Each structure stands twice: as C-alpha cells, then as structure tokens.
C-alpha cells in the first residue's frame, strides 16, 4: 500500500514538472521549486510520510494541474491502476489539496501584484507612486498662518479669503474662481493665476505665461516657476538635458553645504530661492512655520529679507482703488473702539468728502446729526494730523488723530517729504472741514462741489481754485513769520561776487579763446551746473549770516571749492598745458601764453579793487588736500577784509547766477602755467 502511494506521488510530481515548464509566466515561485525537486529526497522521507503533512511544493503542483484540464486527464490515464484502499487514500489527498488551494490562491495573487508594481517602478519613471502634494502653510500675501484657502492648481499656494477680497482676486459669483466639483465628487478650487495659466518668476518676480515664458520646477511637490535664464544663473539649480527644458530649482539644495535636501530636515525661504538644512541654518533666520506638520518643509525668511517690507503690501498700496465709501467707514467706526471722540454737528453744517483728486463734495446732512453740540463752538479748537506711515497700516497707511487746540490747523506729515506750507484758519466760513475729513455715517447721494470763499493774498496755500489738495507740511506760525521777514530783507553778497559784468566779459573771452582745452572746460561747467541749486542756497546762507559770527560762515562754499579743486587736480598730468586765457595760435609758444595771461589779469585788476590771494612758495609741492586748505585760509583772509568793507558800504545787490567754478579754474590754471613757476612771477593772484 505504501509502495503504490509512493509511485502515485512520484508520477504526479513528474507530470507537474512538465506543466511548470509551459506556464512559467503564471507563477515564478513554482518553476524555481520544480527545478530543485529531487525524487531521492522523497524516497528518503517515505518512512515519515503522512497524508496530513503535504509540502507546499505538492500544493503548488496540484494547483497547476487544476488549471490545465487536458494535461490532468492525460496524467490520470498514464497513472498505474491501484487498489481500492489506495484509491480511497488518493481521494483524501485530492480533497485536502483542493482545500489548501483555495487558501493559497489569495496569497499568490497578492505576491504577483506586488511583483508587477515593482517591475513597473523600475521600468517607467512616470508610473512611480508620487507623494501627495502639500500646499504652503502660510498665506502668500500676508505671510501669516491661519484658516487658509488652498489652491488645487500647480502653484500650491494658500490664501486668506480676506486677503483675496482686499486685492480683488476672489469673486464668488465668477464661475472660473468658484469651487468646481469633478467627476469623482471631489471639490477643486484654483486661483486666478492657475486658471489663466500665468504666474510670476520666483527669482525676478516678473509675470509671464506658464509653458511659454515660465517653466515649473520638475519636483512634484514644488510649485515654483522660473524663467529659464533666471534658473541658469543659480549654480545649485540642476538642469536636465531632455527634449523639453526641465530642472530642479535651488530650493531643493542647501545653500551652505550644496547637498540635496531630500530625506533631510530642511527649510526654504518664502521670498527667494534659498534653502538650508536645519543643521546648516545661519543665524538671523526668521521662522514662519513652527508646527510639527511643517517642520520638515518649514518656511523661513533668510537674512536677506529681514527688515524688508512685504512686497505684496507694497503692491496693494499702489494697486488700491482708493474708493472708500462712507458705509464701510461708518461700520468700521461703529464696531471698533477708537480713541477719536464722536463729533456732534448742527443741521446747518455742510457734509462732504475728499476723493483722490483732491476735490471736495457736499451731501445733505443726515437726520441723525441734527442734535445740538454739547460743547460751545468758541471753546472747541481742532487740529487734524494725517500721518502717512507706510510701515504701520496696510490698507491706507493713514492715522487720523483729533486734537483740541486754539486754532484750526491741518497738518499732513509725510515721512518722505519735509516741505511745509501753512493753511490759515477758516473758522468763520460755513465749511466744517472736520466732518468731511473724518468718518461720516451716511453715503454720498448727490455730490455737489463746495464753493469755498477766497482767502487773502497773504496766505500762500489758499487760492480761488483751492481743491483741498493738502501737501505734506510741518507748519509752525513762528516759522512762517521768520520766512516772511527773510523774504523782505535785502540780500547781501560778498564783494568778490558783485562785479557781474566782469564775469560776463571774462566768459566771452573763455568761449572765444579756449579751443585747446574744450573738454576740460566742459567738464567743469557740467559739474558746476549739477550744483547750481546748492550754490544758490549757499549764497542765501552767507547773506543771512553776514551780521553774525564769522566762524563757519563759508563752510559750504569751501566744500564746493574742495570738490572743484579735486576734479581739476586729477587732470594735472595732461600733456597739453592748461591755459583758458590763451588762444590756439598762441598755445605753441610759452611767451605768448604769459603775455595773454598777464594782460587778462591786468584787465581784471582794473575792473575790481579787491585784495589779492597770497600763495606760498611751497604750494607746488603740497598735496591736493593741503592745497585746498591753503586756499581756504587765503580766502578767509580775503573774506574778512571784504566783510569790513561791506559793513561800511552796505551794498545791496540783486541775486544773480554765481560762477564759482571759473574762479577756481582761473586759480588752478594760473598755478599750472609757467608764470607760476618762474622766478620773476609775483606769488599773488587776483580773482575776478
């Protein structure tokens, strides 16, 4: 009986080995086991063989036998006849094999599916399982976390709904912006940039069309777009040579160790393509996300952007419509607890508003403001300070403060301007400027232009065409009085500037005779023309300080002289001798230069009676800075003599254009001429 059982199993194994060779694609494990099978091992284990302990190899072989019915019928015909007892045992074996086959079918299917997936990952990169994309945990505009609306497009940005509404980027009535349900039942929402296939370069911040101007980073979880030229400038960017330009942006590589950040704890800057490993992070980095979920891909601000203004706030200021209705303002003033006291105005007062162009509009007063004032109008004194601070308020950058003083002064202080112009009192008129500058409680229904009475001509900021276009000012009554007194006082100019006719005549000589050094002369005139305004201001400062102490009186003038001196001494090594008073025909001979120069100086001496500037003998060996200091001292001596004469004469001259550059040019040309180096030359120089 045992012998028949052994022969039956051996025959079944041989048949199953033949079936395995034909069906290798269905089950790889069975083919491997069939090759390693030996009948000798089976004969050795016959003594310990039992019907219940069937090996996994036999189970797999029987499974293959059931799949091919034809071969199983052939195997039954080829099997030797067996007794009734052996047939019963074979039936028991077949029943047990069928029960075990049902349990192993599921395991084989799972193994085959896993193997198929592994094979697909190795062959095709596009079929790899990709990690789910995560949106940024910070609002794109305000750079703060909170309840965010996440875009399902390519950009992976997140927004506050309030930030979208403030920038007119969210319109629920628009079909392109409202959430859309897909076929699967999922809800998707995309921002305007993803809908219109536009975005901005993360490097240069310039907008472009996706796919034409801008290219997206190849990394699946990255939503940054770049110009191809901008990415090529970064050494950390990994460019991939394929048919289409693809790249990995610098956000995926540490800027310190220049190693990829995949699988490591890293953070990247929210404003520029800079990333760090947490270990390599530099001091001064500001963390924007501190939660556990965003710890591996944290958002920071690198040290380049610490202290900078948010660029989206800057765009909001310039792109804002500036149309503030009274309804929204009344809601804000009613809900928020502000320190500004409420105004109670009679029914006869005018109500108005100011638009961006500076025009004043009037509307009918509401019925809620017909109460009488509890404070006498003679005691109420008002002043409005409109402070424009670009760093504090993101909406309008205006802080309206109401103060009580003795006069109505409207001061609009701007951080960028320091000009001041006064606005005089207009309390006696029927206009109440406090109300149209402050928040009103009703919208404008029928705006009409206010008629403003004309102010006296002495007021510099009032005019018949006054439209409440308040310029930034820091007004003070005492400063206004001082300014008026300064305008009425006569302007006193030092004596060396008085003879303007001599200057004009000398300029004609320069224009006719200065042909050899036109380039030098043009450079001096250009440098002088750039500083005309500063020179005129210096004249006013000198005239206002004539009756004061002499210390530091001409400091601004000396600074300008030093600038001209340094510019002129830089060209001292030129081959052509510098002499603006010599003609081209006389430039070849040194004697003709000396005669022309001395004749021009004699003409100037005949026209002016000024004192001379004493030049020391060691002037030629001095450094440029020492020469300027020497020139300052000599000019100081001359200025003191001129001031003493002015106190006696008290000359009054109208302000005219000052040509200080020519005086300095004349002096340095004289120092470079041969007359200055000759022994017969008197070491003195007389300016015009």
Swiss-Prot record:
Any one GO BP annotation for this protein: chromatin remodeling
UniProt keywords, alphabetically: Coiled coil, Metal-binding, Repeat, Zinc, Zinc-finger
Record bears the keyword Methyltransferase: no
SUPFAM superfamilies in the record: FYVE/PHD zinc finger
InterPro entries for this protein: NSD_PHD, PHDvar_NSD, Zinc_finger_PHD-type_CS, Znf_FYVE_PHD, Znf_PHD, Znf_PHD-finger, Znf_RING/FYVE/PHD
Coiled-coil annotated residue ranges, if any: 627-654
ZnF (PHD-type) intervals: 136-197, 198-260, 261-287
Stated name of the protein: PHD finger-containing protein DDB_G0268158
